[in-house]
Amino acid sequence: MGDQLRVVVMNSFNHDYASAFRTSLARLGLQAEVIDLPNIELADLTPGKVRHIRHLLTPSAPEQIVIFCPGIMEMFIDGPHHSVHFSVYRAWHDEGASSVLPHPWSVHAAPPRAAIAWTEKPALRAGFMGSIYDDAALVRLGRRLPRPIKRWLLTGRYLRHARMTACAYASGLPVRFALAFPRVEALEALERQAADQDDFDVRIIGTGGFTGLPDAKARYVDEMIASTYVLCPRGSENFSFRVYEAFLYGRVPVIIDTDMVLPSQIPWRDLALIIPYDGLDGVAQSIRDDYERTDAARFIARQRAALDLMQELGTGYWLDEALGGIVRMRRAARETTSACRLRPLSI
């Protein structure tokens, strides 16, 4: 492909996504111009930065294929390029223009299996450790809104206008956590509903942020291992690192579905518990139902499958498939367009 393929990748403060893309492109035998963008904090996003990224996403020649990965940032820019995201909204996801990727990278190391393996049915225990966002002004506002307005907001439609979002940040509006209210609602609902169930242990630990210091990481891992079910409601983006960390430790992620598009490489119904946002009134019962219908053998098998999954995702095969598929699709579309232009008119 030579200079016909350009990949624009935005890294995060924890993860070097550009290196993963370069490795995958090399495995595929694809030559590409990889533009490695530094991490941009949402609070630092400006209209000028959006214009710069939009310029990079403009093909320099008609035959050039451009792929954009904004990292964990929910940046959606329309154009002739193809985007790959970790966070997408079902209401307006276009499979022909964007792809959804898993996020198997973690700051936490994979543990020895023997240290986390279940040998019998675990206790009915659900946990969460992390930022709760209950003190964010827009989260407090979001919780008070009527349910129909909440549902509309959770489709993330306003995020389709990257320049408008950048203007909001540049003007000082604290919009980063505007859609984080389901996290507070889910955690409070579970605590409230399980309060009178003596055999249901719920541990919700708010940290106010993740420092990355050794003690904080060790405590997070300890809480993860102590849990059977791990609450994974969305935060500032419409996905959660915690889902993959739960798989990494062989635990069962409880996903609150807020119009999410989940990566197709994962057998979600087999390995996770998915509860619709409108089902929060029964979140504790949903977890209990899953627990009661799952015997020891099934818990052990599900754990083994989750650990195997993370090993498979660690090979990066899914990124090879995604990039290869995008290139093939774009080539086919270009060839179809060329054929239509060359086809003689029948009179």
Segments (PLM) and residue ranges:
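Short hydrophobic beta-strand element within catalytic cores of glycosyltransferases
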Residues: 252-256
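C-terminal "capping" alpha-helix adjacent to the active site of nucleotide-linked donor transferases
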Residues: 273-297
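Short alpha-helical segment that forms part of, or immediately flanks, the ligand-binding pocket
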Residues: 221, 244-248
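Short C-terminal alpha-helical element
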Residues: 296-310
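Conserved donor-binding/catalytic loop of nucleotide-activated donor transferases
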Residues: 226-227, 247-251
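"Short basic amphipathic alpha-helical interaction patches in structured regions
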Residues: 141-143, 244-245, 275, 288
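Nucleotide-sugar donor-binding catalytic core of glycosyltransferases
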Residues: 2-239, 257-270, 299, 312-321, ...
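Short, hinge-like loop/turn segments at secondary-structure boundaries
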Residues: 250, 271-274
